[in-house]
Regions:
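GNAT-family acyltransferases
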Residues: 1-78, 82-86, 102-103, 107, ...
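Conserved GNAT acetyl-CoA-binding A-motif
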Residues: 107-116
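Conserved beta-strand-loop-alpha-helix junction that forms the acyl-donor binding cleft
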Residues: 115-125
C-alpha cells in the first residue's frame, strides 16, 4: 500500500490543536494520534521540514503524520512520525519515512537525518532500518509530555 505525503495546512493544524478532526481531509477513525498536537504546533515554524499528513494513496484517508526539524547548523534534521494504531503493520510508516528521506535528499541544506525510537517500540526501529538508517546509540530523550525515556538513535547521511 502506498503512502502520499500531504502538507499539513494551518487550518488543519488549528483544528487538531483545538481537539477536533481537521476539515478538508478524510481521516481514519482513530485519528488524531497522541503525536498529532505536537506536529500541528510545527506548521509554519522556521526550521521545519514538513509536517505532512500520511495519506493512503488508494482512498486519500489520513492515517498519521510525519515531519522533521533542523536541530543544528550543519544540516541535520530530526524526524518523527506516527501512524494510527488501526493501521499498524501495513507498511505505512516505512513508506512515509522513505518518502520524507526522498524529499530531504532533494533539499541541498539537509546533510543528515536522525530519528529516535523508544525502546518499548522496537517496530519503530525496524521501520528506520528498512528505510536505510543505521543504529548509532542508545540514549535518553524527552517524550511529548516531557518525561525522560530511553531510546535508540538512528542516523542516515543524505
Amino acid at each position: 500500500m502506498t503512502i502520499v505525503l500531504r502538507e499539513m495546512t494551518r487550518d488543519a493544524a488549528d483544528a487538531i490543536l483545538a481537539g477536533e478532526r481537521p476539515g478538508g481531509v478524510r481521516v481514519a477513525d482513530d485519528y488524531p494520534t497522541e503525536f498529532s498536537a505536537g506536529v500541528a504546533q510545527c506548521v509554519g515554524a522556521v526550521g521545519q521540514f514538513g509536517p505532512y499528513f500520511l495519506q493512503r494513496a488508494e482512498d486519500d484517508v489520513v492515517v498519521g503524520e510525519i515531519g522533521g526539524a533542523f536541530v543544528d547548523e550543519e544540516g541535520t534534521i530530526e524526524i518523527g512520525y506516527a501512524v494510527v494504531e488501526s493501521q499498524w503493520n501495513r507498511g505505512y510508516a516505512t513508506g512515509a519515512v522513505e518518502a520524507l528521506v526522498t524529499k530531504a535528499r532533494e533539499a541541498s541544506e539537509v546533510r543528515r537525518i536522525v530519528a529516535h525510537a523508544p525502546l518499548e517500540r522496537p517496530e519503530s526501529g525496524r521501520v528506520l532500518e528498512k528505510a536505510g538508517f543505521g543504529l548509532v546509540q542508545e540514549t535518553e530523550d524527552e517524550d511529548a509530555e516531557g518525561n525522560v525515556v530511553r531510546v535508540k538513535q538512528w542516523e542516515l547521511a543524505t
